């Protein structure tokens, strides 16, 4: 058993350093093709590459899914002791490697498990959307995102991204009676909802553009709103609030991702929790204020949950790092959980 652990840890180090050396920001996932072709041969798992440049290994009605893309900004991989640094070490190449090795080990044991390295999670989630529209269905899906190694994520908020275009009369600034910038500012203050607690929805302006001339009031103003809301909030009521304030403006929904909340008593949540407990650690249920591919893939699985190694506060930072211990705990958790789920099916 100790030998198996040491072999797994060496493989974690080898594969993670290799994948971190491949820069794969959203839209450039094809750079990882050689890596997955090599792993496919080494692990004897069939490789499929989708149109979105997502990578699938193996077949089965249980899916371990993480994402191969990262936010921009390459960080040269390095290792200090048992800690590995690099862009994506936490989000989400650390979880991805844990899932990749778990898929190999489980298939070697005779379990039919599929692995997915999805594209564009940091963008518009093209990989997850493609999979959701493919017609494929799974009994269980575990999403690999950093969850502090011991947290099991059962809830994510939803998101709305709105483009708003307002029009007014352009006048000389020395004698203007109308000012679209002032009007827009008043409207923003009326609808602004500062992020506070999880249950309360937030409405945050992130882009505002207006005006072309230093001595003329603008004829057009553009505003982008980022709205986050929980399962307890009404999307229709939020949109009604926006439409009521911007009655004369054009409003376009450019992204709409529903919130997700899973049953904490589901088989998959319990299996992941027990998978952690078996190693002598204490797991806890958690929820995240953002969104993930779990929001999109919830409808193609009978049961779904998010779990993975890594300190989530390090996501997207220039200090992304993860320990081999964290990845090994997650790897073991995936194996424990899926073995339990497969035994329940028999």
Swiss-Prot record:
Coiled coil: none annotated. This is [LysW]-lysine/[LysW]-ornithine hydrolase. CDD domains: M20_ArgE_LysK. Pathway: Amino-acid biosynthesis; L-lysine biosynthesis via AAA pathway; L-lysine from L-alpha-aminoadipate (Thermus route): step 5/5; Amino-acid biosynthesis; L-arginine biosynthesis. It catalyses: [amino-group carrier protein]-C-terminal-gamma-(L-lysyl)-L-glutamate + H2O = [amino-group carrier protein]-C-terminal-L-glutamate + L-lysine; [amino-group carrier protein]-C-terminal-gamma-(L-ornithyl)-L-glutamate + H2O = [amino-group carrier protein]-C-terminal-L-glutamate + L-ornithine. Its EC number is 3.5.1.130, 3.5.1.132. Zn(2+) 2 binds at residues 91, 122, 316. One of its GO terms (biological process) is lysine biosynthetic process via aminoadipic acid. The lineage of its organism: Archaea, Thermoproteota, Thermoprotei, Sulfolobales, Sulfolobaceae. Pfam families: M20_dimer, Peptidase_M20. Keywords: Amino-acid biosynthesis, Arginine biosynthesis, Cobalt, Cytoplasm, Hydrolase, Lysine biosynthesis, Metal-binding, Zinc. The active site is at residues 69, 121. It comes from Sulfurisphaera tokodaii (strain DSM 16993 / JCM 10545 / NBRC 100140 / 7) (Sulfolobus tokodaii). It is found in: Cytoplasm. Binds 2 Zn(2+) or Co(2+) ions per subunit. Catalyzes the release of L-lysine from [LysW]-gamma-L-lysine and the release of L-ornithine from [LysW]-L-ornithine. Belongs to the peptidase M20A family. LysK subfamily. One of its GO terms (molecular function) is zinc ion binding. One of its GO terms (cellular component) is cytoplasm. Its cofactor is Zn(2+); Co(2+). It comes from the Archaea. Zn(2+) 1 binds at residues 67, 91, 145.
């Amino acid at each position: 058993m100790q030998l198996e652990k040491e072999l797994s840890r060496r493989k974690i180090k080898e594969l993670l350093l290799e994948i971190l050396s491949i820069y794969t920001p959203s839209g450039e996932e094809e750079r990882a093709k050689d890596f997955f072709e090599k792993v496919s041969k080494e692990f004897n798992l069939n490789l499929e590459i989708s149109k979105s440049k997502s990578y699938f290994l193996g077949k089965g009605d249980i899916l371990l899914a993480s994402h191969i893309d990262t936010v921009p900004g390459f960080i040269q991989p390095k290792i200090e002791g048992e800690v590995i640094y690099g862009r994506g070490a936490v989000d989400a190449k650390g979880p991805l490697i844990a899932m990749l090795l778990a898929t190999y080990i489980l298939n070697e044991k005779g379990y039919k498990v599929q692995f997915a390295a999805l594209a564009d999670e940091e963008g518009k989630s093209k990989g997850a959307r493609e999979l959701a529209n493919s017609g494929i269905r799974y009994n269980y899906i575990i999403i690999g995102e950093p969850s502090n190694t011991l947290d099991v994520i059962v809830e994510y908020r939803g998101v709305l991204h709105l483009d708003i275009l307002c029009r007014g009369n352009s006048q000389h600034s020395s004698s203007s009676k109308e000012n679209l910038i002032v009007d827009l500012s008043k409207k923003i203050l009326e609808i602004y909802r500062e992020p506070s607690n999880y249950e309360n929805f937030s409405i945050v302006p992130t882009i505002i553009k207006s005006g072309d001339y230093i001595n003329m009031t603008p004829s057009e103003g553009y505003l982008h709103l980022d709205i986050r809301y929980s399962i307890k909030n009404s999307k229709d009521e939020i949109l009604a609030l926006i439409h009521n304030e911007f009655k004369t403006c054009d409003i376009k929904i450019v992204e709409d991702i529903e919130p997700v909340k899973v049953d904490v008593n589901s088989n998959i949540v319990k299996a992941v929790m027990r998978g952690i407990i078996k190693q002598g650690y204490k797991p806890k249920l958690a929820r995240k204020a953002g969104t993930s591919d779990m929001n999109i893939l919830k409808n193609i699985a009978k049961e779904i949950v998010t779990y993975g190694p890594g300190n989530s506060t390090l996501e997207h930072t220039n200090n992304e790092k993860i320990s081999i211990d964290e990845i090994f705990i997650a790897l073991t958790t995936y194996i424990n959980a899926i073995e339990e789920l497969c035994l329940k099916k028999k």
